[in-house]
């Protein structure tokens, strides 16, 4: 009898030990995958094979980020020194879009720049190493941007140009797209956005999708779309936006919106990264930002732009001053600490500086 009970005890012990190393099958089931690729139209660049597995597969890098044993899945309040799952390549200073194209992570915004001032500003930016230029129909400077790019001597494929359709163009988007192509005169448009929601925005976006198929536009996206608007809009279109461009700065941080957009495999870009609309001086003079800037031997503007990059937000500050344009490119020889990121996070006022 004792021999039988001893055998039973050994058997029970073996069963218990066999289950000790097993992890719950759904341990990571609820984790946000900010690099998860989305369903996308067929792309023409070979880089897409590395960034997405046939557009609906699982991104290998996302798998690596999401299966670390015991990893805390909650996004830190202020982000780490480089944001968790940051999609940016800080070596090449680019990000791979879900459309299969690479885009620079810093550039020049051209709002309020017109005529010769715009041409000179874009030229100064290109001479300073900038390869991302943002324009729009409503900026009335697409011709000037195109002129500067054409006359730069830089190969067209090395410069990434973004323009936008305004809501008053949504009723005839095909004509608006042709108008942008004619004004820029750059053979193709790297990215076209809808400037903000409006009547006919879905039809306008579908027209941009057709232009992608025709090779006139390479990537499409949205500007001034937030969570509620995206939840309504996305089910009605075929191509997931490659980018969403919103107002983002330390006083308006969109800490709930950014992770949502990134979780869809969409890149986030911030306009007015330095405040804008009369608020720039106030933001650059902020005591916390000034202290951090002094600690790194940098300007307040450089600290704010670096903060955006470490949050995974592409920056397009605007300027007509060649010195400031150059300064705004010098963002890659320092790094903010997690504590510094937290201090800037705490400056959030949820304060928009424009009506969009």
What are these regions (language model features)?
Residues 1-8:
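Bacterial N-terminal signal peptides that target proteins for export
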Residues 16-19:
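C-terminal motif of bacterial Sec signal peptides marking the signal peptidase cleavage site
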Residues 21-44:
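Short, low-complexity, disordered segments immediately C-terminal to signal peptides
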Residues 22-28, 52, 67, 72-78, ...:
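Terminal-tail/helix-coil boundary detector
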Residues 60, 74-159, 274-275:
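N-terminal binding-site loop/beta-alpha segment at the start of enzyme catalytic domains
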Residues 114-126, 170-184, 230:
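Short, acidic/polar
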Residues 174-194, 210-214:
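CE4/NodB-like, metal-dependent polysaccharide N-deacetylase domain
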Residues 197-356:
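Beta/alpha (TIM)-barrel catalytic core signal, keyed to glycine-rich beta->alpha loops juxtaposed to Asp/Glu
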């Amino acid at each position: 009898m004792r021999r039988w009970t001893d055998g039973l005890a050994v058997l029970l012990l073996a069963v218990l030990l066999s289950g000790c190393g097993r992890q719950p099958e759904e341990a990571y089931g609820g984790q946000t995958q900010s690099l998860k690729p989305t369903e996308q139209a067929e792309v023409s660049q070979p880089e897409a094979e590395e960034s997405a597995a046939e557009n609906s597969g699982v991104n290998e890098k996302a798998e690596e980020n999401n299966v670390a044993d015991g990893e805390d899945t909650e996004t830190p309040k202020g982000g780490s020194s480089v944001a968790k799952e940051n999609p940016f390549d800080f070596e090449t200073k680019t990000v791979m879009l879900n459309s299969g194209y690479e885009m620079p992570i810093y550039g020049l915004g051209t709002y309020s720049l017109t005529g010769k001032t715009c041409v000179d500003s874009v030229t100064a930016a290109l001479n300073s190493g900038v390869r991302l230029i943002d324009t729009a129909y409503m900026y009335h400077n697409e011709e000037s941007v195109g002129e500067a790019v054409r006359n730069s001597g830089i190969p067209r494929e090395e410069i990434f140009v973004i323009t936008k359709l305004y809501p008053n163009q949504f009723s005839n988007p095909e004509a608006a797209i042709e108008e942008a192509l004619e004004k820029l005169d750059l053979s193709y448009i790297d990215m076209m956005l809808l400037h903000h929601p409006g009547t006919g925005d879905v039809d306008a976006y579908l027209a941009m999708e057709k232009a992608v198929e025709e090779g006139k536009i390479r990537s499409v996206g949205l500007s001034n779309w937030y969570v509620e608007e995206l939840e309504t809009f996305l089910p009605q279109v075929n191509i997931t936006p490659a980018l969403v461009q919103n107002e983002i700065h330390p006083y308006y941080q969109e800490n709930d919106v950014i992770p949502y957009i990134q979780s869809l495999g969409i890149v986030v870009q911030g306009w007015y990264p330095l405040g804008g609309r009369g608020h720039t001086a106030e933001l650059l003079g902020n005591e916390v930002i000034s202290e951090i800037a002094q600690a790194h031997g940098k300007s307040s503007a450089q600290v704010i732009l670096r903060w955006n990059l470490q949050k995974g937000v592409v920056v397009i500050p605007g300027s007509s001053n060649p010195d400031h344009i150059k300064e705004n490119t010098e963002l890659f020889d320092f790094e903010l600490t997690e504590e510094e990121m937290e201090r800037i996070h705490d400056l959030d006022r949820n304060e928009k500086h424009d009506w969009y």
